């Protein structure tokens, strides 16, 4: 089994060579704490918390996974260099799952068997759901899943804490935007996986909740594939004013390009999981006019204290600013705040203390960005931005 211990801040993880070296275990050495070093009991002096993160470092969503990982690591490194959070250092063990739900579930089981204190930052709807299901008997804290299904937001699921808004929140924001423009002939293009089907269901429900006409059509395609011809043909027949996409960047780019080539002149709107940078790399100037949902502040929001802090640390690395990196940073900062609150409340940090601390974070002001770890349906719509991308890749609000 390959453990990735990410120590080196001076390299850019987004380069192909760097990614190859990471995956082949050449960088760094494995120096993991054993069970005796965990933070499950006792006072905080010299203690550490160990987190387990399964993330796609290869495969369909590797750009998203790497950026998210880098952002989280950047924050954890910064606090660890200052003797941790209230004296508690945070260590992250990372495994590549290649955007495979089966591998993510196996990785989650490995982490739990190794005795990590929480699962952190898993990426992908199917991966998050599978990891939760695989470890439900042990009920580990499951913090900041990236793109988990709305099923993991149910009030009776006490161990999952979501930093990002849900698919339902993004769907509601996008559909409401369409309504303000008088667009009531809406279709959905989605990938045939848990994320795509979940997003499709969320859009359909948002239309009901907003008392708008139902979808005029929907089409599914293989995950992150350019095999979209059947979907293009199906949706061109129903003549939608707007097409909402729940898909990764390759599928999204192929669908936009081929639908426009078929004569479509309507609006494309994307869920945040597509990633602005990956989609721009795939589409180039053809990205112009595409609308995207964003669940975290823009890297260009330099007037926001959170982003100023993020950019200050980023300047000390070779990493590139991105929405996904910011989201990882926010997740790490939110987890660290939970550690701080747990120590302040009990003088120690353990599972019960962390859970209580996270439950108290219903309106945490993180440098101008509000975090609610137990938000109800549609409560997080307020933090979502819709942005339009220009042909040269600039973001307009």
Question: Which residue ranges define each predicted feature?
Answer:
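N-terminal secretory signal peptides and thylakoid transit peptides that target proteins
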Residues: 8-29
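Immediate post-signal peptide segment of exported/extracytoplasmic ligand-binding proteins
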Residues: 39-53, 84-89, 179-184
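Beta-alpha junction/loop-to-helix N-cap segments that form part of ligand/metal-binding clefts
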Residues: 41-44, 63-68, 82-151, 221-228, ...
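Extracytoplasmic "Venus flytrap"
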Residues: 49-71, 95-101, 123, 189-197, ...
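Extracellular/periplasmic Venus flytrap/periplasmic-binding protein
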Residues: 106, 149-151, 158-263, 298-308, ...
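Periplasmic-binding protein-like
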Residues: 111-123, 143-145, 187-190, 239-249, ...
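Extracellular/periplasmic periplasmic-binding protein-like sensory domains
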Residues: 256-329, 396
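Segments of small-molecule ligand-sensing domains
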Residues: 315-325, 336-396
């Amino acid at each position: 089994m390959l453990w990735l211990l990410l120590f080196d801040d001076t390299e850019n993880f987004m380069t192909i060579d760097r990614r190859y070296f990471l995956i082949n275990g050449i960088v760094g050495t494995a120096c993991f704490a054993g069970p005796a070093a965990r933070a499950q009991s006792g006072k905080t002096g010299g203690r550490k918390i160990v987190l387990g993160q399964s993330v796609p470092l290869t495969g369909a969503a590797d750009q998203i996974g790497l950026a998210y990982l880098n952002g989280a690591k950047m924050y954890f490194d910064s606090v660890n260099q200052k003797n941790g959070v209230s004296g508690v250092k945070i260590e992250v063990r990372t495994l590549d799952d290649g955007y495979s739900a089966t591998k993510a579930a196996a990785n989650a089981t490995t982490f739990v068997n190794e005795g990590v204190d929480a699962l952190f930052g898993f990426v992908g709807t199917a991966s998050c759901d599978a990891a939760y299901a695989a470890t439900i008997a042990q009920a580990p804290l499951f913090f900041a899943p990236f793109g988990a299904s709305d099923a993991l937001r149910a009030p009776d699921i006490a161990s999952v804490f979501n930093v990002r808004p849900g698919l339902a929140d993004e769907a509601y924001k996008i559909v409401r935007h369409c309504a303000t423009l008088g667009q009531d002939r809406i279709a959905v293009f989605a990938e045939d996986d848990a994320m795509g089907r979940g997003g499709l269901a969320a859009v359909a429900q948002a239309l009901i909740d907003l008392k708008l006409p139902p979808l005029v059509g929907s089409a599914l395609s293989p995950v992150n594939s350019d095999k979209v011809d059947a979907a293009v043909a199906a949706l061109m027949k129903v003549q939608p004013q707007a097409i909402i996409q729940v898909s990764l960047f390759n599928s999204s780019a192929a669908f936009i390009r081929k639908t426009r080539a078929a004569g479509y002149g309507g609006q494309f709107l994307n869920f945040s999981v597509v990633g602005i940078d990956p989609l721009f790399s795939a589409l180039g100037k053809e990205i112009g006019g595409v609308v995207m949902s964003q669940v975290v502040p823009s890297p260009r929001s330099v007037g926001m204290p959170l982003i100023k802090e993020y950019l200050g640390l980023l300047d000390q690395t070779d990493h590139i600013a991105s929405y996904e990196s910011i989201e990882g940073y926010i997740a790490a900062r939110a987890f660290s705040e939970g550690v701080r609150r747990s120590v302040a409340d009990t003088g120690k940090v353990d599972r019960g203390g962390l859970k209580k601390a996270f439950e108290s974070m219903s309106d945490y002001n993180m440098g101008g960005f509000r975090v609610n770890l137990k938000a109800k349906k549609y409560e997080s719509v307020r933090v979502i931005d819709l942005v339009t991308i220009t042909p040269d890749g600039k973001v307009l609000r």
